Amino acid sequence: MLYKGDTLYLDWLEDGIAELVFDAPGSVNKLDTATVASLGEAIGVLEQQSDLKGLLLRSNKAAFIVGADITEFLSLFLVPEEQLSQWLQFANSVFNRLEDLPVPTIAAVNGYALGGGCECVLATDYRLATPDLRIGLPETKLGIMPGFGGSVRMPRMLGADSALEIIAAGKDVGADQALKIGLVDGVVKAEKLVEGAKAVLRQAINGDLDWKAKRQPKLEPLKLSKIEATMSFTIAKGMVAQTAGKHYPAPITAVKTIEAAARFGREEALNLENKSFVPLAHTNEARALVGIFLNDQYVKGKAKKLTKDVETPKQAAVLGAGIMGGGIAYQSAWKGVPVVMKDINDKSLTLGMTEAAKLLNKQLERGKIDGLKLAGVISTIHPTLDYAGFDRVDVVVEAVVENPKVKKAVLAETEQKVRPDTVLASNTSTIPISELANALERPENFCGMHFFNPVHRMPLVEIIRGEKSSDETIAKVVAWASKMGKTPIVVNDCPGFFVNRVLFPYFAGFSQLLRDGADFRKIDKVMEKQFGWPMGPAYLLDVVGIDTAHHAQAVMAAGFPQRMQKDYRDAIDALFDANRFGQKNGLGFWRYKEDSKGKPKKEEDAVVDDLLAEVSQPKRDFSEEEIIARMMIPMVNEVVRCLEESIIATPAEADMALIYGLGFPPFHGGAFRWLDTLGSAKYLDMAQQYQHLGPLYEVPEGLRNKARHNEPYYPPVEPARPVGDLKTA
């Protein structure tokens, strides 16, 4: 053994060839600060070996290196800029020394090589991979850019276009694509990986392969003519501006850095990467996006822990076909859980099956499945007008009309047709679960399971615990949602649960702005372009359905009369009374016509201004700041109340529910992350300006308390230790 660290070791393999093996104590290898320091020590040992002829890097895990340790990021981002810059210089000196070894080097890459893992293998001369490879640089998705030389080496290896596509989009690619673009030199079966890598090294040692020529381009300026450079970088900047926009500075910074570094050799190019990385790491966007990653891990870990002792349902059923029922049935069948889909009429069943078939055909068009797989999946959805097969199902989700009487009747009837241990769930969006449970003999086997539309796209499923729902019931439904590829978040019961309960105060803020003379077009523009929502409130209401929102608003007002009962006729009432239900009937805040792809395209409709004039004061202008404040304060206040009332368990779960269920702008990180970034005292000052607008604008006492003590909602993060300690960590 030449060297043994906590996460890697170095040993002789054969005849002058050494192997450096990543072997962390846990289930995966991460390139954390300690591993970078250990890698530097191992390379120091290699540099002393006079009889070294070649080096093979490999992993003892199912994946090579999954990336940097993102749990360290938030504390690293708090390190002063100069210290962070110094640490990056140290880390890059380690990879440079790996790249500069006076012998050929090869990485035998299995499974994932992402982020720092990818940057590590870019420093070797050759890369041999297994068919299960996923390799790439996802840093821009975390609000940063590659910091271990990825933005320098990858363009010089692949050419500007392929590298920009991966780096700017934060993409990873599979083995075939990696081989095609030159990111790896070969793909072999897992059992032949090490032997294959040794064979390549022997060829390089014997002079059959010119490893020095392979290495040289990575040390030099990027080989691009002026015209090629202009085209590549202009196109990349245009694409990034279109897709990422101003709220996500990392992708455009990465492109500009690669462009600026193109004319320099490795050292100067790495300096430019360093100068770009450090300011990005100190942005609110980076903290928010890293926070989302960590919250996502937390939420998924919680679901895994909850379901460790239960069996995932093997057979499911959906009550109520149509678009929603068909979407749920498709998602279940697509992920391997056969489903019975019941309705009371043929027309709805046909609609449900058509929806499932349409979604499967999209997978076929994208090349994700072949005709055989499509036929196989669709055959596991069984449409029925009766309860045939219900004695075999483990879980049933009801997705009938949003009417408590109808839902109670359907659930009570179904309870008589299933096994005593079968779990029933309701896909209601607003009706309290405990109210529906009154109709059942076994309320402990019942809970809420709120999907979001369109089911195949929206990641969130709210699992609602009723007063009598058992832990096992919740666990089974969480297991099914996870199996469907969804992110289940368990919430406690109340009208609207979590997501709709906090959405309707936001709509109330919108209605009040319109009442006071604001233009809905400007509100939408501000909330989309400035705050960052994917849709403004008017457009969102058109998509959700004005009739759906009108009904849900009444349910919420009955549930929370003190705050959500309104004493005036609003824009939603006016449009509803005029039979303008949004996209579903082509008339809402806008008029809708289908484009060439069959998608609804919005157009101005002057009639709307006349309708809104009946429920509004004369038009006047509002500043962007006032629009954002008046829209967001009611929502954030309600989010805080939900935490204080234990409707939702943690700030992390609340923020993920908002992002995955409503499209809350990820660069803000969620409502609690936004609050922490703004500061609770500053938020309180802002909210107090609008208290006269009513109870929705009154800040909850718990938040006032946070402001008094200057406390954040997320646990404070300590800066990482000084750079000298990081080196030797």
Curated annotation (Swiss-Prot):
Disordered: annotated segments: 708-729
Entry annotated with the keyword Lyase: yes
GO cellular component: fatty acid beta-oxidation multienzyme complex
Functional pathway: Lipid metabolism; fatty acid beta-oxidation
Gene3D superfamilies per UniProt: 1.10.1040.50, 2-enoyl-CoA Hydratase, Chain A, domain 1, NAD(P)-binding Rossmann-like Domain
Region Enoyl-CoA hydratase/isomerase, residue ranges: 1-189
Binding site for NAD(+): 324, 343, 400-402, 407, 429, 453
Stretches the record annotates as 3-hydroxyacyl-CoA dehydrogenase: 311-729
Site (Important for catalytic activity): 119, 139
InterPro entries assigned to the protein according to its UniProt record, in alphabetical order: 3-OHacyl-CoA_DH_CS, 3-OHacyl-CoA_DH_NAD-bd, 3HC_DH_C, 6-PGluconate_DH-like_C_sf, ClpP/crotonase-like_dom_sf, Enoyl-CoA_hyd/isom_CS, Enoyl-CoA_hydra/iso, FA_oxidation_alpha_subunit
GO biological process annotation, one example: fatty acid beta-oxidation
KW Lyase (keyword) present: yes
Keywords: Fatty acid metabolism, Isomerase, Lipid degradation, Lipid metabolism, Lyase, Multifunctional enzyme, NAD, Oxidoreductase
Subunit annotation: Heterotetramer of two alpha chains (FadB) and two beta chains (FadA).
Name this polypeptide is given: Fatty acid oxidation complex subunit alpha
Species, as recorded: Escherichia coli O139:H28 (strain E24377A / ETEC)
Biological classification of the source: Bacteria, Pseudomonadati, Pseudomonadota, Gammaproteobacteria, Enterobacterales
